Amino acid sequence: MENMNLEKWLRSLDLTNVEKKVVKINTSRRLPAVILVDTSGSMRDYEELLQNSVEELYAAISRDRAACNATELAVLSFNSDITILEKLREIKQHEAQGRNLRFHCDGMTLTGLALKKTIEQLEGRKSVYMNSVPRIKNYAPIIFFISDGKPECYDEATQKLEDEAMQYCKEYIRREVGQNRLIVISVEVGDFCDHNLMRELTGLRDDKHVMKVDNATELANFFKITSSIIISSSKTGSHNLNEVDFSKSR
């Protein structure tokens, strides 16, 4: 019954705000990667660091020709609203290469709805791959999820939507990770995250994909690790990442 409900939920997703274009002369197998960043009020001290780190991430990937051809990147931020800063598409098609992205930290933490928007980007883009002629192959997508707290909402109507989204996102992640069709790496910033939730959102039963950062230096280093993961996976695939322990990486 859970799978039937999940499939119904997936069919209800809004895929209208998904990049439909592909560069057909690019025959590389695609690696979809999403950076999902909590920009609630408590992340305010990291605004400039996030901006600079994302620019450096773009630069690192773009310097590697093979990775640049294979990587498709999306950047989303979330607080009381969910913002698609960059749709999931070939990184070469991001004209500003991250220089236009701004992280304004304020408001609440709608984690479930943010994950739903992330899944819409992934599912929509996979549909584009499937319907392209010739069909575009892809590696398992990677979600890099960064937060310093836990879901927070004070509006009753929004809370209902948040709870529903969180329920289905957990089911989706658990299923896709279990079938090795998705990788989620959670990053706890500081000491106030809901650790059990951050682990659950990796789809794994242990802490292998939960990273902990305590300061700006460690958060900046996480983005360097992220670029290394993306560059490597764009060449050799992401299929083995769910076996890799990232919990001690800083």
PLM features per residue range, with description:
Residues 149-204:
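VWA/integrin I-like adhesion module and closely mimicked acidic/polar interface patches used
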Residues 66, 89, 132-135, 141, ...:
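P-loop NTP-binding core
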Residues 1-34, 40-48, 126-139:
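Acidic, polar low-complexity linker/tail segments
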Residues 70-101, 195-203:
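Short beta-strand-loop
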Residues 54-62, 116-128, 165-173:
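Short, well-ordered amphipathic alpha-helices
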Residues 182-250:
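Von Willebrand factor A/integrin I-like adhesion domains
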Residues 26-87, 96-139, 142-146, 183-196:
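Von Willebrand factor
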